[in-house]
Amino acid sequence: MRLPYVFAATMATLLVSSNALVNSNQAMLSSPNEQHQRQLRSHQTPVEDQEPDEERSLSKAEMKRLFEAGNSLDDFAKHLGIADDVVRAQSSNTVLQRLMQTDEYMKYSTYLNFLSKQNKKKKPPTFYHL
């Protein structure tokens, strides 16, 4: 019976000593829209890309055209110029991290996902030859 009282007294002591109790005074916070002298860094708007019309991913029509033309994933990686990086990324995490930040890798992974969906759509034969 006395053990819960000991725990309650211990917790109350810890809460009081750590100032973890609720304080009714609200902190004086500045709103994010106001600028004061204490802000050392100015928030600048990001510079837009030089070519805003550039597409960074493949459309479904482009992927279908590549698939029907017989382009494999390796052929597409060579076309993007990342074939060597893809091979090196299999053994090096740093190369993989750098590769994953490029637009070419985004196109590569989009085409990889498209190819895997196309392979899932193929139905297996109804009978198997032994």
Swiss-Prot record:
A motif (RxLR-dEER) lies at residues 38-56. Its main location: secreted. Residues 1-20 form the signal peptide. It is found in: Secreted; Host nucleus; Host cytoplasm. Transmembrane segments: none annotated. Keywords: Host cytoplasm, Host nucleus, Secreted, Signal, Virulence. Residues 27-58 are annotated as: Disordered. The keyword RNA-binding does not apply. The keyword Secreted applies. Coiled coil: none annotated. GO terms for cellular component: extracellular region; host cell cytoplasm; host cell nucleus. It comes from the Eukaryota. It holds the Pfam family WYL_3. Gene3D superfamilies: 1.10.10.2470. Induction: Expression is induced during host plant infection. Effector that enhances P.infestans colonization of Nicotiana benthamiana leaves. Belongs to the RxLR effector family. The RxLR-dEER motif acts to carry the protein into the host cell cytoplasm through binding to cell surface phosphatidylinositol-3-phosphate. This is RxLR effector protein PITG_14783. It comes from Phytophthora infestans (strain T30-4). The lineage of its organism: Eukaryota, Sar, Stramenopiles, Oomycota, Peronosporales.
